[in-house]
Swiss-Prot record:
Entry's free-text remark on domains: Contains a PAM2-like motif, which seems to be involved in the binding to the PABC/CTC domain of PAB proteins.
Residue numbers covered by motif PAM2-like: 11-21
Matches recorded under InterPro entries: CID1/CID2 (IPR040414)
Tree of life domain: Eukaryota
Gene behind this protein: CID2
UniProt organism field: Arabidopsis thaliana (Mouse-ear cress)
Protein name (Swiss-Prot/TrEMBL): Polyadenylate-binding protein-interacting protein 2
């Protein structure tokens, strides 16, 4: 079964680049090409966010490992002088804050493309009931 497209009625962009999902998957993260794809392609942005979701940090084991590594890093820097002033509760609250920031920015990226126009344009336009539409100017009824 073949489909023919009438070029006069088509709204497709003839100058658009070829869609190749394999090429999109091979883009290096955070490169200029990656950034261009994330900002211009909703499909790629959703694909990348689903493939690189941060849900693995929500588990207790991974969070405790990160907390221990953070404490070791603080203890190793400055000969342990700062390790006395930082408590485990401070580290845990700081890491939770960072995870919340990451989640909120992910939602903002998605929401920025969903509602791009102002709310005043989303309101329904009401027509004048006395307005005569050109194509329905005459009402034809059977006799």
């Amino acid at each position: 079964m073949t489909a023919t497209i009438d070029r006069r009625l088509s709204t497709l962009n003839p100058n658009a680049p070829v869609f190749d999902p394999v090429e999109f998957r091979e883009v290096e993260d955070f490169s200029p090409k990656w950034w261009d794809l994330v900002t211009t392609s909703k499909w790629f942005r959703d694909f990348w966010l689903s493939a690189n979701s941060e849900n693995e940090f929500l588990g207790g084991d991974d969070f405790s490992v990160m907390e221990e590594e953070f404490e070791e890093m603080i203890a190793s820097s400055d000969g342990g002088s700062m390790a006395d002033t930082v408590t485990e509760a401070d580290v845990a609250s700081y890491l939770k804050m960072l995870l919340n920031i990451a989640e909120s920015t992910k939602e903002k990226i998605y929401r920025s493309k969903v509602s791009s126009c102002s709310p005043k344009y989303n309101q329904k336009k009401y027509m004048n009931p006395n307005f005569n539409c050109r194509r329905n100017h005459h009402i034809y009824q059977p006799r």
